[in-house]
């Protein structure tokens, strides 16, 4: 018996995305927080970034994708969704790992905002130094 749905959790910056892939016979649609991606995200580049693993593997039409994403901004959310899609695709077919790993899509991007330190204006910006 074949699995009904595949799950992947993706994180990027302060965003977290739960991705559910459901096999379908239709053209395959994507919903992000119960909305269409073009309605949810402000620009097309973010949507292309999110759909990159599906374009690489030519599986865009094979799945209905339902995403629940929280936290962060649009770029972080798109990165979290992308990693979630990759992890769910690997559950579906582990042989896709070679293609996805060659484009560095299987690893989490661990870069996060550096914290502000006391005595400074930001993470690194220091007050102006006066010699005399």
Swiss-Prot record:
InterPro entries: Ribosomal_Su5_D2-typ_SF, Ribosomal_uS9, Ribosomal_uS9_bac/plastid, Ribosomal_uS9_CS, Ribsml_uS5_D2-typ_fold_subgr. GO terms for molecular function: RNA binding; structural constituent of ribosome. One of its GO terms (biological process) is translation. Pfam families: Ribosomal_S9. It comes from the Bacteria. Coiled coil: none annotated. GO terms for cellular component: cytosolic small ribosomal subunit. Keywords: Ribonucleoprotein, Ribosomal protein. NCBIfam families: PRK00132.1. Belongs to the universal ribosomal protein uS9 family. This is Small ribosomal subunit protein uS9.
């Amino acid at each position: 018996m074949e699995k009904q749905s595949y799950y992947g959790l993706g994180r990027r910056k302060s965003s977290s995305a739960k991705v559910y892939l459901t096999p379908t016979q239709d053209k395959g649609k994507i919903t992000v927080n119960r909305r269409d991606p073009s309605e949810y995200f402000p620009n097309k580049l973010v949507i292309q970034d999110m759909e990159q693993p599906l374009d690489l593997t030519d599986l865009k039409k094979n799945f209905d994708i339902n995403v629940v994403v929280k936290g962060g901004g649009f770029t972080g959310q798109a990165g979290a969704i992308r990693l979630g899609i990759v992890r769910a695709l690997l559950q579906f077919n582990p042989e896709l790992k070679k293609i996805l790993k060659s484009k560095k899509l299987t690893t989490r991007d661990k870069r996060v905002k550096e914290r502000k330190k006391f005595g400074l204006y930001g993470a690194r910006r220091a007050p102006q130094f006066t010699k005399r």
